């Protein structure tokens, strides 16, 4: 028992000693914390005093800087107000109120256009001693300006004349086919081709040995031309761009006529020889050159004058001189025109059938076939084969009210019902698909 008591007392003393040791450690830690807090407070006081000193120094130097800032702000405010007032005065004077000199009446026409159209190269001046070289300088200047315009167009449209691939023109073939199909339908329904050709042959001046010409056959075909391999190239004069397009047409276009050859010697109608001819175009292929030009182009006028002087134009001998002069007057008015021609390596195939005689008939005489074919080729070459070309004036593309249309939805309207034989009936009307919006 005594040993147990000794052990318990020993453990008790150890516990007491441990507690005292813990209290001592706690007290020491508290003292260390207090010391650290005092040090932190002292540091904060020092920092506070330093900040106060800095603020005092700033307050001492601030009045001088405030005076400078206030003066610069005042200057900026005054200058800004003055500039705004000056801008308002200038705007009111030059933009609101018109100049008194502008009210002086001027002649209409070119004087009014010169103030609207922007002119380039106004600083170019020519002395009196340069009149001999004015023509050459103007030609060189116009050539350079045209080349610069063409280069600008090609650059802005991303088209390389030398390396761009050719186009198929499938979409264009569809549009042309629709147009030709519509024209054929109108020709079949209205017989306008027959009537126009018949009137032309009836009113034509024929020699005394040819009787009246009658139409026997007209075939407008059922196929369509195919345009392909389109490429843009420079013209020979480098003043414009040309579109080279391959054209191929395999169809049968036929015109048949019947007439009589009259022998009026030694007396009128001594003999009569019936003649029947049928000409068919079965194949055409070639390279079509298309370009847009101005009808006031100097080169165009020179070509026309040269062709007239050399006797290329035979239309004047046939009584078309008045129409050609009228066309020249129209071209002098200016405007855009479509110029097209075919290359000399075209392919044109004919089938000519002839029947001569009444009882003993001669069929398909080769001499007659070659004569007619040569005449047709000559007619085509003189009008459409390079270096000759056709010029078609383009209409104005400005939108006009008289050309405006709008689709109309089909609506059914019923009139009041009427009684017929004991049954009621109503009249149904539908308006047209398109109406003219020009009122």
UniProtKB/Swiss-Prot annotation:
Region (Disordered): 125-145, 309-336, 405-425
Domain SMP-LTD stretches: 165-395
Lumenal topological intervals: 1-76
GO CC list: endoplasmic reticulum; endoplasmic reticulum membrane; ERMES complex
Cytoplasmic side: 98-439
Any one of the GO BP annotations: aminophospholipid transport
Subcellular compartments: Endoplasmic reticulum membrane
The entry's keywords: Endoplasmic reticulum, Lipid transport, Lipid-binding, Membrane, Transmembrane, Transmembrane helix, Transport
TM annotation in the entry: 77-97
Family: Belongs to the MMM1 family.
Domain notes: The SMP-LTD domain is a barrel-like domain that can bind various types of glycerophospholipids in its interior and mediate their transfer between two adjacent bilayers.
Protein name: Maintenance of mitochondrial morphology protein 1
Natural source organism: Candida albicans (strain SC5314 / ATCC MYA-2876) (Yeast)
Gene, per the UniProt record: MMM1
């Amino acid at each position: 028992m005594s040993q147990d008591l000794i052990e318990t007392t020993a453990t008790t003393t150890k516990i007491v000693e441990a507690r005292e040791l813990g209290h001592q450690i706690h007290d020491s830690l508290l003292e260390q914390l207090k010391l650290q807090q005092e040090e932190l407070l002292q540091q904060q006081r020092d920092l506070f005093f330093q900040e106060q000193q800095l603020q005092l120094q700033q307050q001492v130097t601030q009045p001088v800087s405030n005076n400078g800032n206030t003066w610069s702000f005042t200057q900026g405010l005054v200058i800004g107000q003055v500039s705004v007032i000056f801008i308002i005065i200038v705007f009111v004077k030059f933009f609101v109120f018109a100049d008194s000199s502008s009210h002086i009446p001027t002649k209409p026409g070119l004087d009014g256009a010169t103030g609207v159209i922007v002119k380039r190269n106004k600083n170019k001046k020519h002395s009196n001693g340069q009149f001999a070289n004015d023509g050459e300088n103007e030609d060189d200047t116009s050539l350079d300006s045209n080349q610069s315009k063409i280069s600008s167009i090609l650059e802005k449209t991303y088209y390389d004349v030398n390396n761009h691939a050719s186009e198929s023109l499938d979409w264009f073939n569809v549009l042309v086919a629709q147009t030709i199909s519509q024209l054929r339908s109108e020709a079949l329904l209205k017989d306008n081709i027959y009537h126009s050709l018949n009137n032309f042959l009836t009113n034509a001046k024929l020699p005394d040995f040819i009787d009246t010409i009658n139409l026997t056959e007209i075939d407008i075909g059922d196929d369509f031309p195919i345009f392909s391999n389109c490429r843009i190239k420079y013209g020979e004069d480098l003043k414009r761009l040309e579109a080279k397009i391959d054209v191929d047409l395999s169809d049968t276009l036929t015109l048949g006529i019947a007439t009589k050859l009259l022998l009026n010697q030694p007396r009128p109608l001594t003999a009569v020889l019936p003649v029947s001819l049928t000409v068919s175009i079965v194949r055409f292929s070639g390279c079509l050159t298309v370009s847009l030009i101005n009808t006031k182009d100097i080169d165009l006028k020179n070509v026309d004058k040269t062709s007239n002087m050399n006797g290329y134009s035979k239309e004047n001998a046939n009584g078309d001189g008045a129409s050609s002069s009228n066309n020249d007057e129209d071209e002098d008015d200016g405007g855009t025109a479509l110029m097209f021609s075919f290359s000399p390596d075209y392919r044109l195939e004919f089938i000519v059938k002839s029947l001569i005689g009444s009882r003993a008939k001669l069929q398909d005489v080769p001499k007659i076939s070659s004569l007619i074919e040569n005449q047709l080729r000559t007619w085509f070459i003189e009008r459409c084969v390079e270096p000759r070309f056709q010029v078609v004036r383009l209409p104005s593309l400005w939108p006009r009210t008289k050309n405006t249309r709008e689709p109309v939805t089909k609506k059914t309207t019923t009139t009041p019902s009427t009684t017929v034989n004991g049954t009621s009936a109503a009249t149904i009307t539908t308006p047209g698909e398109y109406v003219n919006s020009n009122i």
